[in-house]
């Protein structure tokens, strides 16, 4: 006989399988859509929501996602939370149906801007948390899956998943041969930034000078000074928070920092051009792989499971790099943005 607490636990294995299958289906829908439409159609603005701007490339994927959630709701009670939906999410199924209710935080296409111009992969992100109503937090997520959405020039796509308490898993899908092979997920073991990628998000106009000054200050202190004859730390402005975390988890980046909400506060402006909780829906993939995810001051990252909260975050490839950088980042962020 199951204990009462065991009966209320989410079925992690089932959720991983379902989310992987759903994301692979959405990836296929998107590839067909991209193959049949031009850049002008994909990049057109469809609507502006509280969460973000919805472009033409988003529409087909959104429609398929909602259709599949309706079918899933025939056997499971859950609430879908994502941009473009009702502020409190959309409820599927009814109480008592299936396993314990959960909230599914989704960003169907994280990195839209790069993908709609066929420049760089985006990612489909999902994270499931026990349903605690409006009090559900980002850190409550127990299961996460993220799937690479490649450009039309690319036939390989990575799929990453994580369950709380388990090592991150991965697969590399060959979209031509329709095969999948195991993919090891291991962050960099480097103990510093030398000859590695370390980036401070600085995508859009407004506050760029402040962010650049912060970026320089962190790198200079971390490296013990600046050598004008050497390129020792590299920056990658990947307009995709989920993609940034994947780069760290897969060992390609050592550090990423996004302080845009703090910059807007410093400038005395309100802006939605920032990371939102749904952009971090699959952050469990990075943390279960061994990365250190926190706020810019080194405190645990906390955010509601919604679509409107601006989130500042830092991700370090390993504990050694975090120990090196957290004090530097904290001091420089406080000095420049405090």
Question: What do the PLM-derived regions correspond to, one by one?
Answer:
Residues 1-109, 320, 334-338:
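N-terminal subdomain of lithium-sensitive/metallo-dependent phosphomonoesterases centered on the IMPase/IPPase/PAP
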Residues 19, 23-26, 30, 96, ...:
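An extended, acidic
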Residues 49-54, 110-114, 233-235, 271-272:
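A short glycine/serine-rich beta->alpha loop
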Residues 59-62, 119-121, 279, 283:
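Short alpha-helical patches at coil-to-helix transitions and adjacent helical residues
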Residues 65, 69, 124-128, 248, ...:
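Buried hydrophobic packing segments
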């Amino acid at each position: 006989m199951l204990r009462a607490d065991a009966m209320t636990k989410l079925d992690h294995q089932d959720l991983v399988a379902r989310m992987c299958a759903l994301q692979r289906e959405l990836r296929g829908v998107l590839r067909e859509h991209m193959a049949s439409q031009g850049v002008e159609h994909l990049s057109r603005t469809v609507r502006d929501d509280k969460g973000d701007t919805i472009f033409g490339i988003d529409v087909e994927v959104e429609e398929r996602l909602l259709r599949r959630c309706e079918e899933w709701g025939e056997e499971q009670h859950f609430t879908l939370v994502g941009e473009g939906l009702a502020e409190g999410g959309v409820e599927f199924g009814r109480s008592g149906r299936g396993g314990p209710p959960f909230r599914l935080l989704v960003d169907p296409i994280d990195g839209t801007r790069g993908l709609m111009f066929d420049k760089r992969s985006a990612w489909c992100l999902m994270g499931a948390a026990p349903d605690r109503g409006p009090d559900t937090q980002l850190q409550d997520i127990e299961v996460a899956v993220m799937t690479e959405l490649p450009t039309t020039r690319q036939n390989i796509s990575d799929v990453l998943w994580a369950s709380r308490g388990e090592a991150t898993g991965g697969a590399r899908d060959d979209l031509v041969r329709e095969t999948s092979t195991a993919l090891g997920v291991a962050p960099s073991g480097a103990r510093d930034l030398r000859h590695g990628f370390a980036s401070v998000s600085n995508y859009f106009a407004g506050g760029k000078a402040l962010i650049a000054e912060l970026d320089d200050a962190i790198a200079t202190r971390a490296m013990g000074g600046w050598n004008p004859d050497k390129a020792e730390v590299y920056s990658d402005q990947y307009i995709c928070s989920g993609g940034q975390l994947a780069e760290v988890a897969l060992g390609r980046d050592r550090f990423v920092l996004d302080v845009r909400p703090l910059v807007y506060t410093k400038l005395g402006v309100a802006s939605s051009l920032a990371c939102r909780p749904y952009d971090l829906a699959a952050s469990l993939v990075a943390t279960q792989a061994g990365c250190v995810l926190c706020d810019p001051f080194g405190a645990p990252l906390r955010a509601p499971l919604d679509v409107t909260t601006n989130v500042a975050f830092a991700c370090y490839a390993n504990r050694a790099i975090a120990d090196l950088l957290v004090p530097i980042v904290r001091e420089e962020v406080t000095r420049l943005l405090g």
